[in-house]
């Protein structure tokens, strides 16, 4: 039975929602196994270990985010050829994307292993947290090939409208991650590196499952191992669409690393508290993330099929839904912040910092939803450079300049 979803026909709202639902569930489970690290580490290994995991998070996103941005650009190219029903071009785009992922995963592994200590020191990671941060970071990047290839394969499946299989495989890998976390840390008494090891193993599991499915599917997007190679024309298109998205992710990550370095200056309790909030924010923003992913695929497929009016109507629907849902969630986070933060670590200082972070940001989720959805529409239409420039000005120039000045004038983490 055909599991992909053509966005070029049928009810616009139903197509977007039905595609977004498995994306939401998949991202929910992904957040669950990311959060499992923090919950288990925080409760079994203490605040130092939790701070180590938290301090590595933005740095990991910096290095992985660029690669994932390229994968997003590849997804736009694949979705457009799928919508246009150009099988040969679709095949070349898919196999070039996989070849790129293999090369990028190898480079990322080497860079992550060697650059970890220097970057963590530059971020101002406290001396008592630094050793565990390095262990977590290096262990994670030793398995970064699984992380990269999982995102590549999922990007291929989602670009042709298949959200069901990534969901199934992600549920399996999430269960593997949680079981391994408990076994390594609670059962064997292993340290913080075992949390990263559990995540890496689970990502490899999901990547392998996605790859096997793509090799077995009887569709025009079938993966053939012998066909994995670079096609210069496709690589150029992928880079043109992907580099702006990758750079955008890196800009956000660089700004977050800078913010993290300022958080580090407030001590390990602030690091743990703000790290706990970041996990909550990951859950809170899931609906918006799913609508942005669905919008990019919807717009790409419809533009490929030259259904321009349908693409516009879908974009308007997705943006409006995201804004409403995001603000409702923000209100809930604001009200329930103390209980949510305490789930990660009950230390009063950790909860204090986490609640401050939550209540400073939560009510502005609607603005984030609007900007992310507009960026998704622009990416889907092949104008990825526009959100890249906006993010560069907003997240990097304005945000970093503001923090540099504000923290020195008002030494309060809420600024």
Describe the predicted segments one by one.
Residues 1-20, 78-145, 187-243, 299-364, ...:
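Short alpha-helical transmembrane segments in multi-pass integral membrane proteins
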Residues 9, 13-32, 36, 59-66, ...:
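Residue-level signal for short hydrophobic patches within transmembrane helices
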Residues 18-37, 139, 150, 173, ...:
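Transmembrane helical elements of multi-pass membrane transporters/channels
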Residues 28, 32-51, 120-127, 183-190, ...:
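Helix-terminus/linker motif at the lipid-water interface of multi-pass membrane proteins
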Residues 50-110, 147-166, 260, 274-337, ...:
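Small-residue-rich hydrophobic transmembrane alpha-helices
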Residues 57-60, 104, 172-177, 198-206, ...:
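Transmembrane alpha-helical core residues of multi-pass small-molecule transporters
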Residues 62-65, 109, 177-181, 207-211, ...:
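Hydrophobic transmembrane alpha-helices of multi-pass small-molecule transporters
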Residues 112, 155, 181, 185, ...:
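Structural signal for membrane-spanning alpha-helices in multi-pass inner-membrane proteins
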């Amino acid at each position: 039975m055909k599991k992909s979803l053509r966005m070029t026909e049928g009810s616009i709202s139903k197509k977007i929602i039905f595609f977004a639902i498995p994306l939401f569930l998949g991202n929910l489970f992904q957040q669950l196994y990311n959060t499992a690290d923090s919950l288990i580490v925080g409760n079994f290994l203490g605040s130092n270990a939790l701070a180590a995991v938290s301090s590595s998070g933005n740095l990991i996103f910096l290095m992985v985010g660029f690669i994932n941005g390229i994968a997003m650009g590849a997804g736009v190219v694949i979705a457009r050829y799928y919508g246009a029903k150009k099988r040969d071009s679709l095949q070349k785009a898919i196999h070039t994307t996989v070849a790129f992922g293999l090369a990028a995963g190898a480079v990322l592994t080497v860079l992550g292993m060697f650059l970890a200590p220097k970057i963590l020191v530059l971020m101002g990671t406290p001396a008592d947290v630094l050793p565990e941060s390095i262990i977590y970071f290096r262990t994670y990047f030793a398995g970064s090939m699984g992380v990269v290839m999982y995102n590549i394969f999922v990007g291929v499946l989602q670009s042709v409208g298949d959200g069901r299989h990534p969901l199934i495989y992600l549920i399996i890998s999430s269960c593997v991650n949680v079981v391994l976390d408990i076994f390594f840390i609670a059962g064997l008494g292993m340290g913080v590196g075992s949390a990263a090891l559990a995540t890496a193993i689970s990502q490899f599991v999901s990547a392998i499952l996605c790859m096997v499915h793509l090799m077995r599917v009887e569709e025009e997007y079938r993966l053939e191992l012998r066909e994995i190679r670079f096609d210069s024309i496709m690589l150029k298109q992928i880079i043109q669409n992907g580099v702006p998205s990758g750079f955008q992710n890196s800009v956000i990550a660089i700004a977050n690393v800078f913010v993290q370095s300022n958080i580090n200056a407030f001590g390990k309790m602030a690091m743990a508290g703000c790290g706990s909030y970041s996990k909550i924010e990951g859950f809170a923003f899931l609906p918006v993330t799913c609508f942005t992913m669905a919008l990019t695929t919807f717009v790409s497929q419809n533009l490929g099929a030259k259904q321009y009016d349908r693409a516009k109507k879908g974009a308007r629907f997705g943006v409006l839904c995201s804004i409403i849902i995001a603000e409702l969630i923000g209100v809930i986070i604001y009200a329930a912040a103390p209980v949510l933060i305490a789930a990660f670590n009950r230390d009063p200082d950790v909860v204090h910092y986490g609640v401050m972070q939550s209540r400073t940001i939560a009510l502005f989720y609607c603005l984030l939803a609007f900007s992310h959805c507009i960026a998704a529409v622009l990416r889907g239409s092949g104008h990825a450079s526009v959100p890249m420039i906006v993010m560069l000005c907003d997240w990097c120039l304005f945000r970093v300049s503001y923090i540099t000045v504000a923290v020195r004038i008002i030494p309060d983490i809420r600024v």
